Amino acid sequence: MKSPTPSRPQKMALIPACIFLCFAALSVQAEETSVTPQPPDILLGPLFNDVQNAKLFPDQKTFADAVPNSDPLMILADYRMQQNQSGFDLRHFVNVNFTLPKEGEKYVPPEGQSLREHIDGLWPVLTRATENTEKWDSLLPLPEPYVVPGGRFREVYYWDSYFTMLGLAESGHWDKVADMVANFAHEIDTYGHIPNGNRSYYLSRSQPPFFALMVELLAQHEGDAALKQYLPQMQKEYAYWMDGVENLQAGQQEKRVVKLQDGTLLNRYWDDRDTPRPESWVEDIATAKSNPNRPATEIYRDLRSAAASGWDFSSRWMDNPQQLNTLRTTSIVPVDLNSLMFKMEKILARASKAAGDNAMANQYETLANARQKGIEKYLWNDQQGWYADYDLKSHKVRNQLTAAALFPLYVNAAAKDRASKMATATKTHLLQPGGLNTTSVKSGQQWDAPNGWAPLQWVATEGLQNYGQKEVAMDISWHFLTNVQNTYDREKKLVEKYDVSATGTGGGGGEYPLQDGFGWTNGVTLKMLDLICPKEQPCDNVPATRPLSESTTQPLKQKEAEPTP
């Protein structure tokens, strides 16, 4: 494949089509060479629906993770025969025919552990191995051990894992980093993409695409050999995200790809199914029923696609932040996703060059440059002075500021003057006493105020540092770390999310109770500890006063959350 010559710029437009046609076969090949495991709602049909609607378990994920003790077809036949008999007990039937997931063991850390010691001690506790699984298990086998988030999350999750891996690398566990990269490469080769998590019911969607960044992280330890080794899988994942682009007309969308009227190619989140999520079955049905003016399948797809975004759920996806049934994830072009796609294209260019394919490297660079222009044109709100999502229905950029706006800075896709404006907007609207707010809207959803999440703290910190905005970056890290430390001092655990309106409180909202563990919080905490403390004086706990600053940080007053975006 030849790269275009500088003297013939009109050929540049052909490059994306050439790449997409060449790699379209990669995802198809992966799909054709594997038998896709069926999720429990399909395997068990009416039995699954009846069990979930009966609310036998406080958490709908419990039965989704239950393992049939025999062929599901035989269990279903027995159910149909017995269900109308006198004295039939559904709970007893489930207990006889299924092995329920074990409750997570409560980890009690040794007395007197520092924050760093606690995290280092958790890595083996959170490590799982499932080289083989039961035939009808919803859990998908993986060849190498992996680290799970913790709590109800008994499987590996895609985007969580990148931030967990940052911590593993910080702890010197490069073998575990390599194992997890190998697992994700295995999933790409087996299923054509990395699913939301290694469960059959997650196969219809992916999550924020961090695989290329995982390979780049591994390359810090193994050099270009890692980039060359995993180039085929990175190409396959890119083909998955761009699937359908070759036949797309201006103004159309296909699965995860969007082609705007001027030909700009961007991406959105998408789930291939439009049914209730097995792990949140009753909740999804209730959400769809609460808005009879919309087709239920449309709401289900948007709920699933929000889960694919990792932000399940947020006012970011909703017309009315107080009504989940107004979410329309698939008609929104996310700024964070397209920043990650830009980074994927840049890493593919680097890996192609490392493999000696300069022509392909040039083509990926061209794609990255085109996407960067698209981000600057469509995902910047000039009136507000921040990056934001693009609305496919109104054909304009949205007004809401969210922590996702820091992603262009994280991947070095932002213009310098805009990065400066983002620093101001972040400090003015999102920074709180306990860290960075996810949004400034209080909706009751977990990806809204007053919750702060570890991955978004790190993206903001790194992104602002990339553009010389070190004071704001340090403010975010310092306030979040203080929150983590205060919570740990009181409860001896790290949690999934934090209330950033104060310090020392776990977050709330969402579909399930607060989870501890917690993979990505552990990883980001280690990275931040090593960021704020000098290398010659590493710290095991958060210092009482902020290091690396001419003065200690002044306490932040809590900002009032806005009622609407």
UniProtKB/Swiss-Prot annotation:
UniProt cross-references to Pfam families, sorted A to Z: Trehalase
Subcellular location: Periplasm
Active-site residues per Swiss-Prot or TrEMBL entry: D312, E496
Entry's EC annotation: 3.2.1.28
Positions that bind substrate: R152, W159, D160, N196, R205, S206, Q207, R277, P278, E279, G310, E511
Span of the signal peptide: 1-30
Leading EC class: hydrolase
Reaction it catalyzes: alpha,alpha-trehalose + H2O = alpha-D-glucose + beta-D-glucose
Keyword Hydrolase: yes
Cross-referenced PANTHER family: TREHALASE
Purpose of the protein: Provides the cells with the ability to utilize trehalose at high osmolarity by splitting it into glucose molecules that can subsequently be taken up by the phosphotransferase-mediated uptake system.
Name of the featured protein: Periplasmic trehalase
Organism: Escherichia coli (strain SMS-3-5 / SECEC)
Lineage: Bacteria, Pseudomonadati, Pseudomonadota, Gammaproteobacteria, Enterobacterales
